[in-house]
Amino acid sequence: MSPNNQNEYEIIDATPSTSVSSDSNRYPFANEPTDALQNMNYKDYLKMSGGENPELFGNPETFISSSTIQTGIGIVGRILGALGVPFASQIASFYSFIVGQLWPSKSVDIWGEIMERVEELVDQKIEKYVKDKALAELKGLGNALDVYQQSLEDWLENRNDARTRSVVSNQFIALDLNFVSSIPSFAVSGHEVLLLAVYAQAVNLHLLLLRDASIFGEEWGFTPGEISRFYNRQVQLTAEYSDYCVKWYKIGLDKLKGTTSKSWLNYHQFRREMTLLVLDLVALFPNYDTHMYPIETTAQLTRDVYTDPIAFNIVTSTGFCNPWSTHSGILFYEVENNVIRPPHLFDILSSVEINTSRGGITLNNDAYINYWSGHTLKYRRTADSTVTYTANYGRITSEKNSFALEDRDIFEINSTVANLANYYQKAYGVPGSWFHMVKRGTSSTTAYLYSKTHTALQGCTQVYESSDEIPLDRTVPVAESYSHRLSHITSHSFSKNGSAYYGSFPVFVWTHTSADLNNTIYSDKITQIPAVKGDMLYLGGSVVQGPGFTGGDILKRTNPSILGTFAVTVNGSLSQRYRVRIRYASTTDFEFTLYLGDTIEKNRFNKTMDNGASLTYETFKFASFITDFQFRETQDKILLSMGDFSSGQEVYIDRIEFIPVDETYEAEQDLEAAKKAVNALFTNTKDGLRPGVTDYEVNQAANLVECLSDDLYPNEKRLLFDAVREAKRLSGARNLLQDPDFQEINGENGWAASTGIEIVEGDAVFKGRYLRLPGAREIDTETYPTYLYQKVEEGVLKPYTRYRLRGFVGSSQGLEIYTIRHQTNRIVKNVPDDLLPDVSPVNSDGSINRCSEQKYVNSRLEGENRSGDAHEFSLPIDIGELDYNENAGIWVGFKITDPEGYATLGNLELVEEGPLSGDALERLQREEQQWKIQMTRRREETDRRYMASKQAVDRLYADYQDQQLNPDVEITDLTAAQDLIQSIPYVYNEMFPEIPGMNYTKFTELTDRLQQAWNLYDQRNAIPNGDFRNGLSNWNATPGVEVQQINHTSVLVIPNWDEQVSQQFTVQPNQRYVLRVTARKEGVGNGYVSIRDGGNQSETLTFSASDYDTNGVYNDQTGYITKTVTFIPYTDQMWIEISETEGTFYIESVELIVDVE
């Protein structure tokens, strides 16, 4: 059904953004759907376009029922709307709501459902007596809470009535004691994880109850001491309950870690459901403190919640399709690393561009699936629309479909998944997704439809509804029904078992709608802004995973400097004054500074924890700034800095809280500065750029022109803009680099790059797009450098000319810059982040003052020398004689090999500097002669290695078409040829292994031929995996047997007499075969390789340590001997057994091949 039982959806144009034809139906943007669609909901449409089987709707892997999760989400949402000290009537209605949610009726057992679902998820049963006891206690608590709620309502109707006051106060005390006695029943040893969701809901109610003592205690007649004791218990239990929930959540999650995709799915679902039912509640616990929050309070949850991967995952008898999570080759850590985002600043999705690929399956040319194979996201930070970030996932193709969110939230996604499968191959993909959107603050809905065609069987398709996992309340208008908005989309692509199964699936990431998109600060409420909702994090600061009770990630800094900036929106009068406090944890005392324009607030914050201690509830404390302040603008920006502590100490920031407390001379100077900057770009004749002018300087001049007053100097601004636009055109025309503005990374032309590089727009340092390069990735024991490169072809170069690579580095650590031709030029840049002032100058509307900022930047650059820490860089490369056949061209590259490294860079250009002459020309000519001599040597070396490798490969084949292997070829011949091929030099570039070298073509030619030989070798051997390259696959082996890598060869090792290896396989009866075994025996005793058929015919080859004295073929280098025996089986089934009597038996290969003699 459509959300809120409505079909009034706008359908946004689903046309691809390229000219590539699409199999999808196309819809115009319209307020009313077409006649053919106006009565059709998304399920009907998906069935029409994708052949959906209506019996397969829903997600069978959803462990926690939608109604149960809706209960948890509803309770959290209701609490978020009643934080601080709410009106008394709100408290009474809140308890009524809670009772209705957790104890809806005698026929509906929410608590039992929670227990059963968690039992299923962790594959463990709650013992009967424990469950019965817990359910009995919960029933009693529900009854008591219902009575208390009714008594509270009675008293609130007449607060002066002594009898109702006495009743409610007595029932408060009785209910508190009920909780104290009942809660241990939800924390039974051995059942902590199973009962965790029940425990969290129960202790949440207890803390809310204790809050009532602070709100109503005085009116009920409690003494100040009694009220204080209730309050102190509440504070103490808040810490105790919080730490308990986080501890057992982590223990439960850790127990679900595994190695397979199936174990990952269980782990993933537990994480999601426990976040919604447990951790979201825990994050709200401290807000019940009426001393800290005596007025209405806004809190926010910034954690990410991931729905299940959108991939076919049901067991069906239809065709050959299988659930994706049952494939053993898809590993736990692969999926986790690909689909779960690392800790990050809170971001807001702006647009989605989906890339489509066409897949097929082996031996069926008519079968196909057009599916979602990758996507590009654009997103921004909170309250900041000036900087756009881009993230690419999966495969980027030419067929694209895109849509922008603008002022809308995606609140539900319904997707069709398909498994195109036959006996030989399985393809997984998403051919359709329906994105349901609502205009923020209204119930006006639109929808975007991504739809592609496929030929998968009906029973091999499935519909995923995000509302199965993050439910919607269909009983209220859309604006009130959704609790989460789509914030990101990750993905995982896989190709396993030689592409026997392959595919790609997106994973939708959601954030809670309590996370305000504008960082709104209210004049009549306490406003909490999580630290991850900053718009910029300065270098050295990091986002780290939250401890579990903060509702999201937190910020960390280990050295004194600026932490970051926060854009805010003030809702109320600018005359209102505020006091600020910070929730933090720290291993050291430090000074915290807040900057707001000219206002600077400082305070000394104390250490809260010891070095090496874990982050617990008690390690986080609040500290306030003493003086209050006013905001200057409705849209304002705050900068936070930490100082006066030793590097290596740790400071964590959870959130910032704002508590409301009862033009002509400068314009002329700006014009003169802009004129000077623009004039400096051109030659005296104004028809070309001045030599040495960089693209960065052109952009910065444009910034100065942009800041000129439209009112005072409209004509001057127009003329200067025309001039700077011409300068930009000239700058682009001379640049030999493709895609210097970073429109696309890893596209068909231009830049090739490693993963993780971000394209960023609109930064204060860079006017246009620039790149953010992360440090090298560490995976297991391997380090994978971050790299970016492109080639400038020989055809665009001039002979005997100097070119120069230039660019601008905002900041960097360990950035290596290369130009490569016959030789490699390299520089390393370690550039401090010191261009901008600590507090950015702003205009009256709160935006960054580019003119003032440019003056600061210029002053910094003017005093900068050309050392390794300079922001600008320039790297020359001289071109001599051109060789279009060799096409060496110029390779431009950037690399970071240190995991701690980073860089931001832009305005990259490769420009012609001028012809070479004099000493420079003579030096280049000498270098070229030396290069030619060196190349002659390299070619001679290459020819020797190549001819030896080619001859070795040629000897493997009996024909010139490489279709038949020589009958006497053994595995040693293949490995010898492989070693020769690997010895071919200059296959890849020395600095960038991703760049092909001079012998890449020869190397790949021989590698492909060798692979063909391996394939033929495997095909002719009647014994599967006879060379043990696939370990013990196909073999039956006792536990002590293993396959070892010895001299780059897979060798079966039988270490003891009681170990054995065997296999049953199929042959052609009455066909003459030769059993050929290459093996080596160590120590006393014999090794045996025996074969037999179903007619009890058998042959045995015996190996001993003294085989070098007997017949057989002996390899002096390896110590292995090859023995053969002829065998004619009578049956089609044969058996082989390998064993030994003593010592160790090494078997390199076992072959049973047709005797061609």
From Swiss-Prot:
GO terms for molecular function: signaling receptor binding; toxin activity. Pfam families: Cry1Ac_D5, Cry1Ac_dom-VII, Endotoxin_C, Endotoxin_M, Endotoxin_N. Residues 15-25 have a biased composition (Polar residues). Keywords: Sporulation, Toxin, Virulence. One of its GO terms (biological process) is symbiont-mediated killing of host cell. Residues 1-29 are annotated as: Disordered. InterPro entries: Cry1Ac-like_dom-VII (IPR048645), Cry_V (IPR041587), Galactose-bd-like_sf (IPR008979), Pest_crys (IPR038979), Pest_crys_dom-III (IPR005638), Pest_crys_dom_I (IPR005639), Pest_crys_N_sf (IPR036716), Pest_cryst_cen_dom_sf (IPR036399). The keyword GTP-binding does not apply. Belongs to the delta endotoxin family. PANTHER family: ENDOTOXIN_N DOMAIN-CONTAINING PROTEIN-RELATED (PTHR37003), PESTICIDAL CRYSTAL PROTEIN N-TERMINAL DOMAIN-CONTAINING PROTEIN (PTHR37003:SF2). This is Pesticidal crystal protein Cry8Aa. It comes from Bacillus thuringiensis serovar kumamotoensis. The gene is cry8Aa.
